[in-house]
């Protein structure tokens, strides 16, 4: 059963080193995860769910309503008002949530989050707020390690040579639990981690599936199987620094009673993710401001080679929703190998 995931879902692309990309909004489907798209790769991150919940519960005191006839906007509002990820899906020492009014709340957040997460890499908030402006903020961080480090290697992904990791010893293969296998282009793997409360999945295939369908797939997997000595495993390193500014929601007026003269001033989420032969880490923060409208199977050897689009899911063992899901579609998030190597 899917339990504790990373509050992030990403449909990845190719990248040589850590790349920050411009936002592209994904088509919103009512009832699905509120994801966005970076160069053809879909990302869901849990911090925005936490920030939206904080604004809704602590400030507005009701589900948020926005003034828009755009069905895509309303689908996003619905999805955020019916969150797939809440604070119950991650332990308290992995997140920080705060809301308040005026410039003092920005200063308080910047100070408090550094105390709780002294190794935070994402930038401090730089917002300037009026005394009546409202801010809701959420931050989460996770880092996991495989039980045994993998070997570094290179591989081809969609025609490009990228840095990768592979299992070359019995101890490395013991990191991998095969949950479902139809063929070399359709299978589900779980990576065994040092952290007993965390889970990380890799799913190859299901290119047209929604995030909701991928989460359901993991929940319904069968009995785990160990890899055989003749089986092969490779997956690319990943590196991501992304920002979503929600341009379709910024400027929309609130319809909630008492907030009709306010609009969304800023709605930003930042995601930093790394995956290599040692483990994986994610940082994710989200901020929403409310401002006045006057302001701005077979015994044959299996080749478990992730050389085509695949999914990655990270969660806590007993949570309902993942905190990280990545659909890797191309090599934009990978570390390209120079032709000289």
Question: What is the predicted role of each segment?
Answer:
Residues 1-6:
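Bacterial N-terminal signal peptides that target proteins for export
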Residues 19-341:
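Hydrophobic-core positions in well-structured secondary-structure elements of globular domains
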Residues 7-16:
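Bacterial N-terminal signal peptides
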């Amino acid at each position: 059963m899917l339990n504790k995931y990373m509050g992030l879902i990403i449909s990845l692309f190719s990248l040589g080193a850590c790349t920050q990309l411009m936002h592209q909004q994904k088509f919103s489907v009512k009832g699905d995860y509120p994801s966005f798209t970076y160069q053809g790769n879909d990302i869901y991150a849990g911090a925005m769910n936490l920030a939206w919940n904080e604004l809704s519960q602590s400030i507005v005191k009701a589900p948020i309503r926005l003034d828009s006839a755009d069905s895509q906007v309303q689908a996003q509002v619905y999805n955020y008002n019916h969150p797939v990820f809440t604070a119950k899906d991650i332990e308290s020492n992995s997140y920080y949530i705060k809301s308040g009014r005026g410039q003092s709340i920005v200063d308080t957040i910047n100070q408090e989050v550094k105390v709780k997460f002294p190794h935070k890499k994402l930038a401090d908030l730089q917002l300037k707020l009026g005394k009546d402006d409202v801010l809701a903020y959420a931050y989460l961080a996770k880092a996991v390690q495989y039980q045994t480090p993998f070997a570094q290697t290179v591989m081809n992904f969609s025609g490009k040579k990228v840095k990768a990791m592979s299992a070359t010893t019995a101890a490395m293969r013991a990191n991998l639990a095969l949950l479902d296998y139809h063929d070399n282009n359709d299978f589900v793997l779980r990576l065994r981690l040092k952290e007993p409360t965390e889970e990380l999945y890799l799913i190859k295939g299901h290119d047209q599936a929604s995030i909701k369908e991928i989460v359901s797939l993991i929940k319904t997997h069968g009995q785990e199987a160990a890899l055989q000595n003749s089986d092969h495993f490779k997956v690319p390193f990943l590196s991501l620094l992304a920002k979503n500014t929600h341009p379709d929601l910024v400027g929309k007026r609130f319809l909630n009673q008492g907030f009709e003269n306010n609009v969304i001033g800023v709605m930003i989420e930042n995601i930093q993710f790394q995956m290599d032969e040692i483990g994986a880490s994610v940082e994710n923060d989200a901020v929403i401001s409310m401002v006045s409208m006057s302001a701005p199977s077979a015994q044959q050897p299996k080749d478990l080679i992730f050389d085509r689009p695949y999914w990655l899911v990270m969660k806590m063992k007993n949570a309902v929703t993942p905190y990280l899901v990545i659909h890797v579609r191309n090599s934009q998030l990978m570390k390209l190998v120079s032709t000289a190597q």
